[in-house]
Structures are given as C-alpha cells and as structure tokens.
UniProtKB/Swiss-Prot annotation:
InterPro entries: AAA+_ATPase, Chromosome_initiator_DnaA, Chromosome_initiator_DnaA-like, Chromosome_initiator_DnaA_CS, DnaA_C, DnaA_dom, DnaA_N_dom, DnaA_N_sf. Plays an essential role in the initiation and regulation of chromosomal replication. ATP-DnaA binds to the origin of replication (oriC) to initiate formation of the DNA replication initiation complex once per cell cycle. Binds the DnaA box (a 9 base pair repeat at the origin) and separates the double-stranded (ds)DNA. Forms a right-handed helical filament on oriC DNA; dsDNA binds to the exterior of the filament while single-stranded (ss)DNA is stabiized in the filament's interior. HAMAP family: DnaA_bact (MF_00377). This is Chromosomal replication initiator protein DnaA. Domain I is involved in oligomerization and binding regulators, domain II is flexibile and of varying length in different bacteria, domain III forms the AAA+ region, while domain IV binds dsDNA. Oligomerizes as a right-handed, spiral filament on DNA at oriC. PANTHER family: CHROMOSOMAL REPLICATION INITIATOR PROTEIN DNAA (PTHR30050:SF2). Residues 71-256 are annotated as: Domain II. Keywords: ATP-binding, Cytoplasm, DNA replication, DNA-binding, Lipid-binding, Nucleotide-binding.
Length: 593
C-alpha cells in the first residue's frame, strides 16, 4: 500500500544515503499498515529487518515524527514467507511498494545533493537577490533568534578515529541502536553479500568511479567472505567516532576549534586591512546576510586567520549554542577520505551541512583535488541555501587559483571578496606597540620605528622579531633601545641588507618587467623601460639607506634630482594607478620575504 508519510521518508533517505545503502536496505521495505498512530513496515527477511533496526530506525522515526501526517510509532516486521533467523535468498527480487522517482534531469544549474528533511526546521524560505542567486529553498540565517535549528540524532565529534568503538548508542542514522545478540552463529555468506551490493547488468543505480580520482576506488573494495550479525555491528561501529558525553539535544557534536585570543578588540587596524575588518564585523553582526560567503585573501601573516577567528568568537559569544566550526582545508580533505574509508560519507555530509557557520582556512589546498572539490561544492550549496554563513581565506584572488574548478571560483564571488594588504609603516609600529604592551615590556618609539622600517614583509615576522628583542632584553636585564635591537636582530638585518641591495633590486625589477638589467642603466626613455627604472629607484630609496646621489650613480650615473622625481612619480601613481600599486606590492613582497 502507498502512504504519503512513508513516501516522504523514502525521499529524504534517498537524498541522504549513498545509493548503494539506499537500494540495499531502504528500497525493499514496504508499508503493510499506516494510521495516525502506527506505521508498520515489512522487510523481506530477518537480515534486512535487523540491519534497518540497528542502523536506520532512529532516523526514520525522526523523519516520520516531523512529517505532515504527525507523530507515529514505527514497527518493522518480517514478511511471513521468510524463514526465522537470518536468511538471504539469493537473486530474490523484492519490488518496492513505494515508487522512488529517478533523479530529476539537470536544469543547467549545479545543485547540492543534500536536502534537509521536511519538517526539521521552522525556517522560512525565500530568494536571495543579494547574491544574484534565486532559490525557492533558501532559509533565513540560523542565527535568527526566532528560528529553531533542526538537530540530527547522530552523536559524533569528528571523523578522526578509524578504530572500532566498543560503545553502543541508541541513536544514530548509521551507527545507532543496541547490538544484536552476541551468541548468534556465524553464517557463511560468500557471494551472497556480493549479490546484495553488486549492480545487475540492467541496473543504472551505480556509477563507476572515475579512474582519475583514486579516492573513489575506496568504495569498491571486496566484501568479506564470512559475516555474522556481530561482524556487521563491529563494522558499523567504525563508521563514526562516538562521544561519551551526549549533546543536550542529542544532536551532532560540533567542536569549533576557535582560538579565543583572536578577537576584534586586539586586531590592529590600518589602511591595509580596514576593509577586511569592516566586512568581518558586518558578518559577525549579520551572519548569513549579503556578505555570504565572505572570501578574504592576501599574503601570509597579514591577519586573515585572525579575522576569521574573530568572527567565529563573536558568533559564539553572541549565541553560545551556535554551531561554528573552524578548520584548515586539509582537515576537510582528511575527514572526507576517512569517511570514504569507513563508508560513512553520509555522516560526513550531515556533520558539515548542519553547522551554523563554516570557517575554512587556506582554501587553495583544494586545488587539484577533484573529489574534495566535488564534495565541497555540494556542501557549499547546501550551506548557502540554508542561510548558514561561510568564510574562506586564501593566499590569492580566487580567479588566480590554478587547479580549482570554475564553478567553485564563480561561487566564491557570490558574496564579498576583500583583500588584506601588507601593513604600512604606521600600522607596523602600532602592532609592535600593542604586542609589547601585552608582554608588559616598554618599547620606545625610536626602537619600534627601527624594527618596523626593517621588517616589512608580514605581521608574523614582525612579531617574531619583537619576541627576539624582548627575550634579549630580559636575558641581559637591559631596557629596549635601538642599540639592543641591532644586537638582537643582527643576523636578520645582515641577511636583509644582502637581499635588498641596489643590485638585487635592479635584478628583481628587471625580471618582473621582463627587461634586461642593462636597460635600467641605459639612456633609453621608452615607457617600457622608463617606468620600471622609476619603480626600481623608488624601491632603492624605500628599502636601502643609500643617498639620492648614490642611487643615481647606480642607475647609469643619473642626477639626484632624477631619482627624486622618480620617487615622487611612483608615490603619486600608487594612489591613482592600480597596476602600479600592484606591481610595487608584489616587488616589495619578493624583496622583503
């Protein structure tokens, strides 16, 4: 018989489970009785009945209790024609009582394969015109106080453990319920389990894994020859890593991994990062809004991770129960590989798609990893349509990431993309003063300016240099001065002096503009040579301690007024010409890193 409640449940499970699991365990179930109080399902044999009770019962009960038909009790029985015990009839064909529609044809737009179970959330759905992406399934932000977040009945901390767990839980869509009797005999099933999982010639339910992606081959490993119910339980227990302490709502456990020392209050703002700070502050105030996703890019050690953690900490402080997860992109890949190995990809999807905010650092690590990009693409779509905030960081503009799919690059630009530039002199001094104050070590202005003038590349190296100075002052019991800074950083300063000599500046500039070093010394005045020469003079004045006449002599014996004109010209062009500004920034990074 057909039942709308069961049809809805089947549709949800088909979206959540891998096709192999769905076709093997869910499709054979049929409805024998359905009323306002009871839903009675019939399994073709005892083997399927026990497996569904052990692995899927809690999830089925959750879906039917939230369905339009209202709460029902669930009963799963065995067909009368099946013998008692565990019998597997080879080549048996059990026609499903509930028709399962084939996947809809492509509409030309990439969609997430994950659909939240109907009734699990009271969120309203609306389009999202801010991102230029209209969807009838888009929910409001999960941080809205008027909205209830749905919880999943699966306990898990992370996908980190590949060892079988001895603990048994009564909850879980894949690994819940108490274990079957331990005294059941081991039953030879050689070839039988293979029949359960192996597609027939006429079946199109399974797709051959792409040979270009070795990760997919994990799913096609051989089936064990002899199994028992105890074996199956032990295997199922490996799918997820259990936690001893249950969540208050019995849902998935999310560890945020945030560094609580990275907050907005201790972020030093300057011209180079003020746009990034403003965007991050707006996201913290209105997560899931117009700035979703927020994509922050820039060089190493410039504060991208600090801003990301600051947003996460602000969200948790604002709503302590918020499911905020921070991780490096490498961790996402490792979790996915572990889920494939344990055949727990559905758990992986449920974990990452049930967060309120997902913060992923160094997204460029996905480059060249096709399977990881595929999974992240669907996770990205599911979170975005659910109104859940996404924050990503990268070391370069998304369009410049080689090995990243175009559909991901385009989606990264749906929200707001901001750049973090290397800090200017005043910001570097402010950072040094703030760090010295937190270390309770007075830092004179002249010493701070000396360090800031010599360390330009990034904040991380700046802080490292300050730590060396403070340690030297404490060990020698001296106050910090320019002389002490010279002593503490003498090896670093000597190396830097070698790297930023006029000769090295000329070589780097010539390579950057694809001209010869001799062209910089020549009398040629064509634009293709004159502009690089002016840039090289500007960098020599900015990075070295040579006088204007000395710099002029190094560029073919030019007058000091020519050098002064070049410095002023490049300084002015940086305000009006984005190309010159980008060239100077790239050359500074090359010369000072």
């Amino acid at each position: 018989m057909s039942d709308p409640c069961w049809e809805q449940c089947v549709s949800c499970l088909q979206n959540e489970l891998p096709s192999q699991q769905f076709n093997t365990w869910i499709r054979p179930l049929r409805v024998e009785e359905s009323s306002t109080l009871l839903l009675r399902l019939i399994a073709p044999n005892r083997f399927v009945q026990d497996w569904v009770n052990d692995k899927y019962r809690t999830r089925i009960e959750e879906i039917i209790s939230n369905s339009d038909a209202g709460p029902k009790s669930l009963e799963i029985a065995v067909a009368q024609r099946a013998r008692a015990g565990f019998e597997v009839v080879r080549n048996a064909k059990v026609a499903p009582a509930v028709p399962v529609p084939d996947p809809l044809p492509s509409t030309g737009r990439d969609e997430s394969s994950f659909q939240p179970p109907k009734g699990n959330t009271s969120a309203d759905y609306s389009g999202h015109s801010d991102l230029g992406f209209q969807s009838p399934h888009r929910r409001q932000s999960p941080f809205s106080e008027s909205q209830e977040r749905f919880t999943q009945p699966l306990e898990m901390s992370r996908f980190g453990s590949g060892r079988p767990s001895n603990e048994r839980s009564n909850e879980g869509a894949i690994g819940g319920s108490t274990e079957s009797s331990a005294d059941r005999e081991r039953i030879p099933l050689q070839g039988v389990v293979e029949d359960l999982f192996k597609p027939t010639k006429n079946s199109n339910d399974f797709v051959e894994p792409r040979s270009t992606d070795p990760l997919l081959e994990i799913e096609s490993r051989p089936i064990i020859e002899t199994v028992s119910p105890r074996d199956i339980q032990d295997f199922g227990s490996q799918l997820t890593s259990r936690v001893k302490k249950k969540d208050v709502e019995g849902g998935i456990q999310h560890k945020h991994n945030l560094n609580t020392t990275f907050i907005f209050d201790n972020f030093v703002v300057g011209k180079s990062n003020q746009l990034g700070l403003a965007a991050a502050s707006q996201v913290a105030e209105n997560p899931g809004g117009a700035y979703n996703p927020l994509f922050i890019y820039g060089g190493v050690g410039l504060g991208k991770t600090h801003l990301m953690h600051a947003v996460g900490n602000a969200l948790v402080q604002r709503k302590p129960g918020a499911r905020v997860v921070y991780l490096h992109s490498e961790r996402f890949v490792a979790d996915m590989v572990k889920a494939l190995q344990l055949n727990a990809i559905s758990d992986f999807k449920r974990f990452y798609r049930s967060v309120d905010a997902l913060l992923i650092d160094d997204i460029q690590f996905f480059a060249g990893k096709e399977r990881s990009q595929e999974e992240f693409f669907h996770t990205f779509n599911a979170l975005l349509e659910g109104g859940q905030q996404i924050i990503l960081t990268c070391d370069k503009y998304p369009k410049e990431i080689n090995g990243l799919e175009e559909r991901l690059k385009s989606r990264f630009g749906w929200g707001l993309t901001v750049a973090i530039e290397p800090p200017e002199l005043e910001t570097r001094v402010a950072i040094l003063k703030r760090k010295a104050e937190s270390s309770r070590m007075p830092l004179p202005d002249d010493a701070a300016f000396f360090i800031a003038q010599r360390i330009r590349s990034n904040v991380r190296e700046l802080e490292g240099a300050l730590k060396r100075v403070i340690a030297n002052a404490q060990f020698t019991q001296r106050s910090i001065s320019v002389e002490l800074v010279r002593e503490a950083l003498k090896d670093l300063l000597a190396l830097q002096d070698r790297l930023v000599s006029i000769d090295n500046i000329q070589r780097v500039v010539a390579e950057y503009y694809k001209i010869k070093v001799s062209d910089l010394h020549s009398k040629r005045r064509s634009r293709s040579v004159a502009r690089p020469r002016q840039v090289a003079m500007y960098l020599a004045k900015d990075l070295t301690h040579h006088s204007l006449p000395e710099i002029g002599d190094a560029f073919g014996g030019r007058d000091h007024t020519t050098v002064l004109h070049a410095c002023r010209k490049i300084r002015d062009l940086q305000e009006s010409d984005a190309d010159i500004r980008e060239d100077v920034k790239n050359l500074l990074r090359t010369l000072t890193t």
